[in-house]
Amino acid sequence: MGSSFQFFDIIFFALIAAFVILRLRSVLGKRTGHAQRDSDSYQTEPLGAGLTQIQVADPGFDPADFVAKANSAFEYIVATFAAGDADKLKPLLSKDVFAGFESAINDRAEKEHVLETELVRIKEAEFLEANMSGRTASIKIKYTTEQINVTLDEDGEVIDGDPDRIAEVVDIWTYERDTQSSNPNWVLVATETLQ
């Protein structure tokens, strides 16, 4: 009897997802072909289905609001990592990600190196994946940014990077959140730098 309830739950949520997608399409309108491609890449079907699953589990979830807050988190985490403040990073990162960040911060401190990072701008923040696994929502974002990254030694001499060069950096960050938790914050659970 329990499996028949699960079957009906799946059907029920699939119908809700289909309804939400149809409503979104009617509200958002159609492209004329003259519009520029925007960063609302979450309109693709598999990604849209994942975002819809998250919205069903967390009715307060808004993809545009998520990207705005994720961009702010990206800026804050990059700046805080460069400043070497592990204590401020800890509540924002999973245990594994925090361990990697803390290790890099400690390694810099032992060598008396200083990382100077200037995030010039976020060119694009693009949804790559969104899904639900049990109660946990997971979203993967691809950030294309312009940054100046310089590492200085204990004498203030540049040992890595160029203070006059703006580099394009592509990062993929994965955020997760327990949708049944009263804590509204997402946690950074994975990072990958492509360039």
Regions found by a protein language model. Give the residues of each.
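Structured, amphipathic secondary-structure segments that form assembly/contact surfaces
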Residues: 91-195
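Core segments of small alpha/beta cavity-forming domains
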Residues: 46-130
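Juxtamembrane and targeting peptides
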Residues: 2-72, 76, 151-155
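Short alpha-helical basic/polar micro-motif
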Residues: 22, 87, 173
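Generic detector of bulky aromatic hydrophobic side chains
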Residues: 5, 19, 53, 81, ...
